[in-house]
Amino acid sequence: MTYHIDYAYTCHAGKVRPNNEDNFWCCGEYLPVSNHGTEEIRTGLRLRESLPVMSVFDGMGGESQGEMAAWLASDSLEHFYRENKGMLRKAPELFLTEACKNMNQAVCDYGREQRISAMGTTMAMIAFGKKEAYICNLGDSRIYRFSKGNFSQISRDHVLK
């Protein structure tokens, strides 16, 4: 069965912060580390066979490095996807797990090299496989399903209380 995915996305710094600590990775597109978001709503269409992956990152600052953490995760996903797209076809859950490990390692390595103790990013990701969609999230970036005119949260927050 062939299906297609219509999608739209945007990214905006908001009115409070001078810099944008968010980023995304949408079928190979992501923003540079220093950005003010997108100026438009971007749209696209992908066939299931192309195994599209989409992710959002919400950088956490501490030492004004939230934008770097979000970019590092996006950039890491870009390289991981290119090198491991075959894994997504054969073992999508393993792909998501390994992608998350890879992104986390990139952020941790940078923080260690730069002696930054408080930097990180949350993440929500969806990958479309042959017959199913696979989701994962880290932190409090949420994934919702829209069905029959209603949104319902399908991810679970990972936060300390």
Question: What function would you assign to each model-found segment?
Answer:
Residues 1-161:
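PP2C/PPM-type serine/threonine phosphatase catalytic domain
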